[in-house]
Regions:
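C-terminal non-catalytic interaction modules
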Residues: 76-164
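Composition- and surface-driven signal marking solvent-exposed, interaction-prone regions
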Residues: 39-40, 56-58, 78-83
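Alpha-solenoid helical repeat architecture
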Residues: 8-21, 49-61, 92-101, 131-139
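Alpha-helical protein-protein interaction scaffolds
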Residues: 1-3, 10-17, 21-24, 28, ...
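Amphipathic alpha-helical segments of tetratricopeptide repeats
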Residues: 1-10, 39-50, 83-94, 124-128
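"A position-specific structural signal for the A-helix of alpha-solenoid helical repeats
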Residues: 16-30, 57-71, 104-105
């Protein structure tokens, strides 16, 4: 069955396969399996699938990379990844307030509860601006931050907010 699945997946459009990988990465984040998410990220990079994503999903993928490394407590690497993410955003147009806020957090020195509360507050304020509201629909970032503040499982918080 597994070999038949590989054949079927290999026959799909590479951009669709990349999208599927991003969806599975999100579910790995959601269910607290960051090691598996990192394996998928590395596989996507090795196969060049990250280059098959459109601009929007590439931004989402890059944000997931930051989130996974935060979950794994790879803080030194996180700073470099945040710098690379900001350069990518600047090359591809003007970064939104949402993107700048998250990149600034991941580039930061402190990831304690106060820094998370500050990030949550800033993003909550940004969420009320109509031009950036759509960014919160793709990534449940506020729930993810709440998960890190409270220590509750991410999936539990999503259920509490009746998301996914």
């Amino acid at each position: 069955f597994e070999s038949e699945m590989k054949i079927h997946i290999n026959s799909l459009d590479p951009s669709y396969v990349a999208f599927l990988h991003v969806s599975v990465i999100y579910n790995c984040i959601r269910f607290a399996i960051p090691e598996k998410a990192l394996d998928l990220i590395n596989r996507m990079n090795a196969l060049g699938l990250d280059k098959k994503l459109d601009k929007l999903y590439n931004k989402v993928f890059r944000l997931f990379v930051l989130m996974v490394h935060f979950d794994l407590k790879n803080y030194r690497l996180l700073r470099n990844l945040a710098e690379a993410h900001l350069r990518y955003l600047q090359r591809n147009g003007k970064p939104t307030r949402f993107e700048k806020c998250l990149t600034r957090f991941f580039h930061g020195i402190s990831f304690d509860k106060d820094a998370l509360l500050q990030l949550h507050s800033e993003l909550t304020e940004i969420q009320h601006h109509n031009e950036e509201k759509f960014q919160f629909e793709y990534i449940q970032i506020l729930s993810w931050i709440e998960h890190h503040i409270t220590g509750q499982p991410f999936a539990t918080i999503l259920r509490k907010h009746q998301i996914g």
